[in-house]
């Protein structure tokens, strides 16, 4: 599973990355987190406000920091599609 954090490196972007890393660790999910700071790449996802979280190339949230439970739900949705598990 590939999780991308889109943003300029601002405090909210760093917070989203930290929260996402924490959720992954607690869930025990095999995932890679990538930071995307290039504005053209960010706009390529249709994101106009950061931070944003993209899981397996699907934008899940942008313009805010989702809570841990919300991030967990996004990961579970994609894990089910990818591996057939929750």
List PLM regions with ranges.
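Local sequence-structure signature of Cys/Sec-based thiol-disulfide redox active-site neighborhoods
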Residues: 1-19
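Immediate flanking context of iron-sulfur cluster ligation sites
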Residues: 2-5, 33, 44
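Thiol-based oxidoreductase modules, predominantly thioredoxin-like and allied folds used
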Residues: 29-41
